[in-house]
Amino acid sequence: GAGEAPLKENLAAAILMRAGWPEVARRGGGLIDPMTGSGTLPMEAALMASDSAPSLFREYFGFLNWNGHRAEIWERLLKEAGERKSAGMKKLPPIVGYDSDSRGVKNAVVSLERVGLKGFIHFERREFASCVPHPKMKDVPGLVVLNPPYGERLGELRELRPLYANIGRRLKEHFRGWRASLFTGNV
């Protein structure tokens, strides 16, 4: 939701690896993040599934000024990485991010352009209670991955119990056969 710290890209990538996303994507299964916030999980999922090299869109690396740096090799590697990403983007499974907060969705959409993913991920304002597989995801079970809000204090934990129960119900009722991965500070 709004005001929460966004998930770091490396942590999002680790969550997706642990959840089995690369295998789900290879099978053609899609990804839904029903509490997407700033959209980090769907964006990392797209980069991973498209075989994009980490930091491919970055323009500067410290080694570029190193005396031993060989620009021709670096340029060739960048070209190869760009070609692999282009080929991977053509085979990208459906990836969707939903959030109840319209500001988060707007920020996620803006971020898509920054990382070269505009048009490849669908973000939309939607309450968790109405999350179902996207119409493009009917054929192959995918992955639901979410980072729900979590409480630090005991009172907050009690307030979250209904949310976590609702998550379980929603997954059982509407995502049969799908994988699910929840990242939370609560056990």
Regions found by a protein language model. Give the residues of each.
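A short acidic, Gly/Pro-enriched loop at the edge of an enzyme's catalytic core
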Residues: 130-145
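A short SAM/SAH-binding and catalytic strip from SAM-dependent methyltransferases
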Residues: 145-152
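Conserved Class I SAM-dependent methyltransferase catalytic core
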Residues: 90-94, 98-111, 152-187
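Non-catalytic substrate-recognition/targeting regions of SAM-dependent transferases
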Residues: 1-2
